């Protein structure tokens, strides 16, 4: 058997060692500016004369003999001119502003024919029971296929393979190709990550692994891909990656996502996987001749470690938008990393040519699979949506449905009747609730708003509350985001990536689960959440409780405008003279001010942060409006000016022991007047080495992650919404000195709600050891620094939105705690 595949982490454990550079996330771009909206009823071809990017001789693809980004637009313009089968549209822009190209290959369609395809696609989703009864529907419907290329920028060859296949289909005179294009539409996202393609990096220009972002959608490239899948509703999709030798073809090992219609999914995905394997073997590559091992299918060939549990990856998100066959393919011959630097160009190009051939074979096999199973795949997609709309119980997949499917592969869930996102006093954050509603809608989950008060599941709700009826076609996606998740620690030892998440528990809003009963609620569908910003009409100073990231943005916006802000126990108070500015930010960020009255606090200035942080944390800090300068051991050693810094944030890439004498002296001087906030192992080590707070950090198992229960005392700097937080490589603190206060602790009755957290082989580092232990602590160093240490992951991949204010509050407190108390006028 092939060696067990090893997956590369993205924004994972390496976040504790590699500080984001100054080039990452320099600004938050308005990446969709100037991108035209798509007219889904236009006929085909849809010819677009793409603007030509400037030539870049440093494009990393050139060394491999592959097409540089600046060569793609002229190639696509030429293919559009050469026939009537190829259409190109710009679907968005990357973080750094590069166009994202969607290519559609299909037989020509008039506007009325395109409108008919849209009507059928809508029928399949919106009235699947009727679609299932329409025996003529498959013959009239072009089955959509989605090919996603180059989502990891330094896994290049999918783009070149896609362009090769597009040209073949565009120019072929084979009647079989004409028949294929008359019965399908093939959609190619030619390069999902142009920033990374040019730079030769896995991540995009903001430092994000895009293939970890699908249920967060923090990045514009992911939002574009998400919309393509919603708009096209593919029956099959493949996502082209590298590098695993032999070629890795999904389906995956357990654990399997519990919210899929897995009986339909595994039957089709395994069949297409076998077809791709055969096509790749037919190329004739061998270990002896080429260094290419035979393909491997994790479901068949591995026990665990390459799973489809979290919906953060493209092929694991696509089934919720209707794909009944969905795959990652990893071509075999590594050309990135040290190989890119050290191997001769001739060898790199030999490897890239093999990878391109293999990727092209996978694309051809997939469209052949859809051609041969056209009607059955459409029927299975209809069945996915029908089960959701009917509210049927989750089905347990029969053992042996495909060879090797055993008890270890069976994962199920129980769908509730509905979720309610309350309005009124029961809602801890109307701002967070609005963000969650908008996120659900952006994912094509149906949300309604109650027109009148109602009672459901034994609870009364006011008008304006939001309702997610789980009898809807995409109930799997709604549930995978809103359910608490599951503790899968007992079932597997190794996981591919994160194992626990929950928008309901981590995004700051109150979400109620309704398990049964009749749903007679006077409600109407919504396309966006209702506005939440307000300023009271009464005179006097205004108060804004900072419990959501949008409230942090509002405070930082006011500070940037020069508004005098007083900080008092988690509340920002602004004077009556700033009412107009408050009204502006209330509308801009959807935040609600209240009347302040008299309050005692400390003056808060614009908080300037030096951050030795991971790319996702740097992005999140800037998204919240903080003025952030990236630093690292090397930056400090080069001579750093601390005069413009209020707080040092440390989570990655700063080793106190490695600092030179001058850098250490400058840091010591800063600690007499500045604050420190740290996160994770690197942050805890910095605290110890710098002699800040008296505390012993204890490490949980390194790959442990998930949603955890926590407790926070009144007045905590780290109040946890609903009593939950998130961990990845968790830490806790023991041996606390008298200067240390516990701001947050892991639940004494066991912390893990959902995810994967086992003890290490020696029995240490498990969740039982963390019971009742300090997760977040604060205190004053004798030199003057106000310090906060996080053992949790409050900004992980920009995902746990409800936890961001904990970091902001720590930064505000750390910057302002030395100020004298004042009375707000």
Give residue spans per PLM region.
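Secretory targeting and sorting signals
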Residues: 1-3
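Intrinsic-disorder/low-complexity accessory segments
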Residues: 5-93, 99-104, 110-111, 116-156, ...
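Amphipathic alpha-helical segments in well-structured domains
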Residues: 162-166, 222, 664, 807
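Histidine/cysteine- and/or acidic
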Residues: 175-179, 210, 218-220
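Core alpha/beta catalytic barrel or barrel-like domain that forms the active/cofactor pocket
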Residues: 189, 196-203, 237-253, 276, ...
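Short, charged loop segments at secondary-structure junctions
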Residues: 204-214
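Active-site-proximal loop/hinge segments that shape catalytic or ion-binding/gating pockets
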Residues: 218-222, 227-282
């Amino acid at each position: 058997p092939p060696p067990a595949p090893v997956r590369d982490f993205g924004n994972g454990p390496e976040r504790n060692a590699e500080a984001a550079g100054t080039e990452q996330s320099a600004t938050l771009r308005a990446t969709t500016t100037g991108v035209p909206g798509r007219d889904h009823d236009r006929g085909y071809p849809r010819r677009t004369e793409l603007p030509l990017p400037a030539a870049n001789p440093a494009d990393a693809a050139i060394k491999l003999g592959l097409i540089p980004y600046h060569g793609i637009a002229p190639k696509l313009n030429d293919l559009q001119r050469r026939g009537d089968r190829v259409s190109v549209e710009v679907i968005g822009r990357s973080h750094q502003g590069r166009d994202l190209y969607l290519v559609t290959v299909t037989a020509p369609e008039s506007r009325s024919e395109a409108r008919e395809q849209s009507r059928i696609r809508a029928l399949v989703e919106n009235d699947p029971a009727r679609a299932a009864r329409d025996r003529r529907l498959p013959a009239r419907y072009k089955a959509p296929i989605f090919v996603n290329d180059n989502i990891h920028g330094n896994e290049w060859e999918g783009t070149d393979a896609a362009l090769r296949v597009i040209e073949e289909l565009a120019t072929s005179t084979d009647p079989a190709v004409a028949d294929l294009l008359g019965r399908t539409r093939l959609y190619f996202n030619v390069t999902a990550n142009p920033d990374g393609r040019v730079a030769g990096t896995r991540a995009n220009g903001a430092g994000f692994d895009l293939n970890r972002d699908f249920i967060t959608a923090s990045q514009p490239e992911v939002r574009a891909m998400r919309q393509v899948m919603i708009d096209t509703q593919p029956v099959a999709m493949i996502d082209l990656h590298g590098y695993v030798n032999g070629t890795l073809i999904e389906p995956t090992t357990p654990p399997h996502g519990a919210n899929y219609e897995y009986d339909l999914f595994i039957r089709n995905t395994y069949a297409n996987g076998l077809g791709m394997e055969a096509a790749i073997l037919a190329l004739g590559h061998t270990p002896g001749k080429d260094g290419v091992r035979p393909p491997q299918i994790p479901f068949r060939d591995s026990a665990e470690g390459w799973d489809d549990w979290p919906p953060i990856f493209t092929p694991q998100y696509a089934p919720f938008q209707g794909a009944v066959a969905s795959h990652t393919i990893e071509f075999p011959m590594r050309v990135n990393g040290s190989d890119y630097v050290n191997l001769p160009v001739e060898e790199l190009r030999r490897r890239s040519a093999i990878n391109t051939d293999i990727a092209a074979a996978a694309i051809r096999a997939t469209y052949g699979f859809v051609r041969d199973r056209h009607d059955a795949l459409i029927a299975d997609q209809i069945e996915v949506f029908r089960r959701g709309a009917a509210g049927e119980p989750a089905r347990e997949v029969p053992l042996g449905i495909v060879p090797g499917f055993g008890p270890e592969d069976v994962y199920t869930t129980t769908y509730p009747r509905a979720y309610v996102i309350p309005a009124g006093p029961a809602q801890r954050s109307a701002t967070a609730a609005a963000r969650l509603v908008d996120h659900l809608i952006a994912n094509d989950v149906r949300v309604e708003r109650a027109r009148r008060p109602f009672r459901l599941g034994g609870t009364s709700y006011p008008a304006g509350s939001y309702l997610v009826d789980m009898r809807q076609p995409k109930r799997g996606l709604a549930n995978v985001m809103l359910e608490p998740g599951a503790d899968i620690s007992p079932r597997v030892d190794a996981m591919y990536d994160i194992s626990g998440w929950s928008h309901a528990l981590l995004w700051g809003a109150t979400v109620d689960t309704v398990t049964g009963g009749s749903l007679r609620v006077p409600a109407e569908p919504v396309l966006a959440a209702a506005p939440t910003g307000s300023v009271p009409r009464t005179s006097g100073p205004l108060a804004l409780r900072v419990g959501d990231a949008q409230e942090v943005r509002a405070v930082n916006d006011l500070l940037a405008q020069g508004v005098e802000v007083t900080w008092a126990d988690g509340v920002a108070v602004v004077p009556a003279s700033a009412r107009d500015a408050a009204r502006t930010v209330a509308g801009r960020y959807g935040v609600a001010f209240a009347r302040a009255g008299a309050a005692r606090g400390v003056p808060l200035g614009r908080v300037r942060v030096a951050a030795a942080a991971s790319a996702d944390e740097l992005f999140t800090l800037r998204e919240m409006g903080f003025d952030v300068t990236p630093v690292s051991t090397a930056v400090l050693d080069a001579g750093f000016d601390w005069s413009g810094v209020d707080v040092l944030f440390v989570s990655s890439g700063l080793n106190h022991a490695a600092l030179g004498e001058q850098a250490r002296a400058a840091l010591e001087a800063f600690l007499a007047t500045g604050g420190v906030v740290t996160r994770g192992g690197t942050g805890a080590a910095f605290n110890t080495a710098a002699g800040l707070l008296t505390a012993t950090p204890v490490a949980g198992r390194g790959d442990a992650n998930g949603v955890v229960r926590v407790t926070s005392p009144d007045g905590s700097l780290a109040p946890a919404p609903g009593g939950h937080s998130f961990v990845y490589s968790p830490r806790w603190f023991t041996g606390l000195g008298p200067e240390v206060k516990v701001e947050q602790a892991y639940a004494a009755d066991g912390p893990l709600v959902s995810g994967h957290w086992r003890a290490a082989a020696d029995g240490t580092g498990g969740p039982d050891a963390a019971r009742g232990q300090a997760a977040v602590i604060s205190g004053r160093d004798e030199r003057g620094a106000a310090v906060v240490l996080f053992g949790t992951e409050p900004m992980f991949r920009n995902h746990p939105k409800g936890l961001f204010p904990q970091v902001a509050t720590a930064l505000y407190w750390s910057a302002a705690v030395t100020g004298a108390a004042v009375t707000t006028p």
